[in-house]
């Protein structure tokens, strides 16, 4: 963790180059702002059949840490929001979900 998953309207999916740039932005934000180890960062892009709402939904799952205060998470979300607009031209709904170690069961 963190895992950053983007569900993007299939009809408005950005070009591969734009997604690669956004992926690099996400890795940078996760390692610098959230202080995650590079090996623990995952970024995934999913094509979605859009129903209603923003054309992008960003779902961030992360491990709760004392360094990830509300102010840090707000800074992360603001920077992520700007990166999404800069790389895709689309508006995103961003949601972050923190998990404590006792509530997280994982492999690999």
Predicted feature descriptions by range:
Residues 1-108:
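A domain-level signal for the structural core that forms small-molecule/cofactor-binding pockets
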């Amino acid at each position: 963790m963190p895992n950053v998953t983007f569900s993007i309207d299939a009809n408005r999916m950005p070009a591969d180059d734009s997604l690669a740039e956004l992926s690099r932005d996400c890795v940078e934000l996760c390692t610098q702002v959230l202080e995650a180890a590079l090996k623990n960062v995952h970024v995934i892009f999913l094509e979605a059949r859009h129903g209603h709402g923003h054309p992008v939904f960003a779902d961030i799952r992360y491990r709760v840490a004392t360094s990830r205060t509300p102010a840090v998470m707000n800074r992360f979300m603001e920077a992520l929001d700007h990166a999404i607009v800069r790389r895709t031209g689309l508006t995103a709904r961003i949601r972050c979900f923190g998990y404590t170690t006792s509530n997280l069961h994982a492999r690999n």
